Amino acid sequence: MNYWTKKFTHLNRKYWNGKLSTIKVVVRDLAKDGAEGLYHYPYEDEEAMIEIDKNLTHHEKTNILLHEMCHHAVEELYEDRPYHDHGSEWKKEMRKCGFIGRINSKRGRYKTKAG
């Protein structure tokens, strides 16, 4: 298990009491994707996975991981599991993790409004 997958496990215990299934976390260059982080939904034979941009600081990677974990939480914890993108369920999970201020799809690197 790599460092960031272990970090996922730690944050899962801290914010979700370990309720989320552990998924693989990969750190790579996401410049071509134009993203800081990606959550891949489970589909057919593909398992869920999180990718984080390698060019971020450790602090930013941690917050991006939380952002993507909130997508995973909506997928696993909400009964209807609608395609949620950055909807109300996801925003609720972001606030649960300590993100404050305006919560939208661009929020991830920083938890506070100042960031």
Predicted feature descriptions by range:
Residues 63-76:
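Active-site recognition of the HExxH zinc-binding catalytic motif
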Residues 1-60, 76-115:
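Metalloprotease/metallohydrolase-associated module, dominated by Zn2+-dependent proteases
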